[in-house]
Amino acid sequence: MEPRAAVQLIVFGERNKTDVDGVLGDVRTAGFPAFEAGNMFETYGESQTRRLLNENGLKVSGAHFGYREYADPDKLEAHIAYCKAMGIRNMMCSGVADTKSVEGYKTSCKLFNEIGSRLKDEGLIFNYHNHAWEFEDLGGVTGMEIISTETDSTLVKFNIDVFWVAFAGKNPVEFIQNHADRAGYFHFKDGKRGDDGKAVFLELGRGMVDLPACIQAARAAGAEWIVAEQDRTELPHLESVTISRDYMKTRLGV
C-alpha cells in the first residue's frame, strides 16, 4: 500500500481560528487530499466541520492532542468520540508529564499503555509524536529510550517526526528502521539550526533533512501517512504548502 499525503494545519497559525474556509481552500488548492488537526468539533461544531470537508473534498488523516488532553478523562472521551464519528484512526500525542525527569517519562508510559489499549479496543491507534527533547540525556538514559522500553509496541505506535530526530543529532533513517514495528504515521518536516541554536522551520526540501532517504525507510516500514508539518513559515501560507506539496510529489513520490 502506498502512503498517502496530508498536511498539518499548524502552519496556518491563527488563520485556523479566523479563516478556516480559506485555510482548507489553500489545502485543496495546494493539492493535499487530507490534513491533520485537533478536535474540529470543539472549534467549529460537527455540522460546520462536515460542511468544510465536503465542500473541499478533503479527508482528515489524524487528530493531534497534547499530553494533558490525554491525561484528562473527559477530554479523552470527547476526542475518542470525535475520531470515531469522523472515521479517523490515528490519534497523536505530544509531550509527557515531565520532560526533565525519568519518573515523568515512566509515569507517562504507564498512561500511554492504558490509553493505547483503550484506543485499540475502539479501533483507533495511539501514536506518540517525538520532538528533540526526548533524546536529551537524563543521567544515562534518554526519554526516547524509556518510551521504547516501557511501552507496549502493539499499543503505542510512533508518529515519527524526521526533522526533530535529525535536530537532536540522530539519524532519522536509522530511527525509522529501528522502530519499524511502531512506524506508520510520519511527520515530514524540514528546517535547519539557526545561529542561536534554535530550530528554523522551512518548506520541504529546503532544510537539512535527507527526505528522499527518509521516504525510502518509511515505505519499507509500511507507512500509511506522510504528513507535511511546518510549525511556521515566512512565506504566504498557500505558497508555503504548495512548495511542500510539489516536493512531495516530484521528489518523494507521495
What are these regions (language model features)?
Residues 1-89, 181, 249-254:
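N-terminal pre-domain/capping segments
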Residues 21-22, 74-79, 105-113, 140-145, ...:
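Charged helix-capping and loop-helix junction motifs
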Residues 236-254:
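C-terminal helical cap(s) of enzyme catalytic domains, especially alpha/beta-barrels
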Residues 3-9, 35-37, 60-65, 91-93, ...:
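Hydrophobic faces of well-ordered beta-strands that scaffold small-molecule active sites
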Residues 227-237:
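A short, acidic, flexible beta-alpha connecting loop/helix-capping segment that sits on the rim
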Residues 7, 27, 35, 53, ...:
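Conserved, mostly hydrophobic/aromatic
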Residues 24, 35, 121-208, 215:
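Acidic/histidine-rich catalytic cores of soluble enzymes
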Residues 41-42, 68-158, 165, 238:
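Active-site acidic/histidine proton-transfer and metal-coordination neighborhood
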